[in-house]
Each structure stands twice: as structure tokens, then as C-alpha cells.
Design a protein with these regions (language model features):
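N-terminal, Lys/Arg-enriched amphipathic/low-complexity engagement segments
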Residues: 1-5, 18
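C-terminal peripheral helix-coil segments that are non-catalytic and often amphipathic
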Residues: 2, 138-142, 146-149, 164, ...
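Helix-turn-helix
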Residues: 18, 26, 30-60, 64
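Amphipathic alpha-helical segments used for helix-helix packing
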Residues: 101-124, 174-180
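Amphipathic alpha-helical packing segments from all-alpha helical-bundle domains
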Residues: 119-149, 156, 160
Length: 220
């Protein structure tokens, strides 16, 4: 990445995206705890002061990357679902979780966003994040509405429930990176209370109902 000053709006957008791309590479290779603005400056060849022109803190940068990864995941999931017809709710629930869990960095940042990133960024960055979550829910609700012919409000509630269930599963699952450190009773419980199990336990009972036909009771 060149250190020349980005002057035009397009150049600034390109530089911002380049910074995010490099940050993603570092996070995937070294992990969150090892990621610093110093390491990013070294890898990009930019001064730290330049990085702070685009992101006011490490947390703001990582939150922006999380939003980007989350948008990409929703894109992939919705595209893949076009081939999965006729719709099967239980199968969709499993595919939804699997598509999310396929990206380890997305999973890691999703677990950090609410308590480890958002509290440490300015209001503007928080607003951007909340709007991104709403955008994701709106797009997913469109899938539910189209595939299951449910009421729009129900489709929207279901989409939010799916996203909340992902967060809840990360917090409540009996699961660690190394389950061997768990006591025997928790290892046994973890066999039926993994993140995937907790997620499915929350969303499977929420199968959408078809919209009622307002003319269904009218006899010809």
C-alpha cells in the first residue's frame, strides 16, 4: 500500500477498504489479541496517524470489519438459499448456522461486538453498526417472507430472532476451544449443548405460519 496521501473521495474510500482488508489478513493469521494499530501500520506501510484519520481507534476499525464480514456472510447465505427450494424450515435453520460458523473470524468478532467493541467507539460508529444489523435483519426477513409466505411482521420478528439466537448461542453454549479442560459433567453436557445445538433449540420452535387468506372463508 502506497503512503501517498489519498485526496479524492474515491481514493479515500479505496484506502479505507485497503486498510480493512489488511486488518482482516492480520486478524486471520495472528488473532484478535495480537492485532494492534502498530502492527497494522507496519504491514500497510502507513503512519499510525494516517490510520487514525480513517478509524479513531482499534475497536472502531475492528467493528467496521465485523460489519463488512457480516454483510458478506448475509450475501453468501441469501445467494445460496436461492438454490434450496422448495423451502424446508428445519433445513434452513441448520444451513443458516452452518453458513455463519464457516467463517471463524466472523464468529470471533460477533462474540466481541456487543461487549468488547461497541462500548469503546463513538456514537457515530455505534449508529453505523446498529443500522448494519437492521439492514441484515431486513434482508433475511425478505427471505422468510418469500419462502414461507408468512406475514411481513412475522418475517421481520423471525429474522431478528435468528440473529439474537446466534448471539445467545455464543454466550450460553457449553463449548470451549479446548473442551478437554472441562470437567466430565460439562463435557457430556457439551455434547448436546454446543453453539449449534443452542441455536437450533431457540429457532426450531419458531417455524413461520402461512399468511391467512382474507377471502379464505368466503364461499362462492
Amino acid at each position: 500500500m502506497t503512503g501517498a496521501r489519498a485526496r479524492s473521495l474515491d481514493a479515500k474510500r479505496a484506502r479505507r477498504q485497503s486498510i480493512l482488508t489488511t486488518a482482516e489478513q492480520i486478524l486471520r493469521s495472528d488473532g484478535f489479541d495480537a492485532f494492534t494499530m502498530n502492527s497494522l501500520a507496519t504491514t500497510t506501510g502507513l503512519a499510525k496517524g494516517t490510520l487514525y484519520l480513517y478509524f479513531s481507534s482499534r475497536e472502531e476499525l475492528v467493528l467496521a470489519l465485523y460489519i463488512h464480514l457480516n454483510d458478506d456472510w448475509v450475501d453468501r447465505f441469501l445467494l445460496a438459499e436461492k438454490a434450496n427450494l422448495p423451502p424446508d424450515y428445519a433445513a434452513l435453520c441448520a444451513r443458516f448456522y452452518q453458513s455463519f460458523a464457516a467463517d471463524a473470524l466472523l464468529v470471533d468478532l460477533a462474540g466481541r461486538a456487543a461487549s468488547g467493541l461497541e462500548p469503546y467507539v463513538a456514537t457515530g460508529a455505534k449508529v453505523t453498526a446498529k443500522r448494519a444489523y437492521a439492514r441484515a435483519a431486513r434482508r433475511i426477513s425478505g427471505l422468510f417472507y418469500q419462502n414461507f409466505d408468512c406475514d411481513p411482521a412475522q418475517a421481520q420478528r423471525l429474522a431478528w430472532a435468528f440473529l439474537a439466537a446466534l448471539s445467545g448461542a455464543q454466550q450460553r453454549a457449553i463449548e470451549m476451544q479446548d473442551n478437554s479442560v472441562l470437567p466430565e459433567d460439562l463435557r457430556k453436557l457439551g455434547q448436546i449443548m454446543s453453539c449449534k445445538d443452542v441455536f437450533l433449540n431457540m429457532v426450531l420452535p419458531l417455524a413461520p405460519r402461512h399468511r391467512e387468506d382474507p377471502f379464505g372463508d368466503i364461499k362462492s
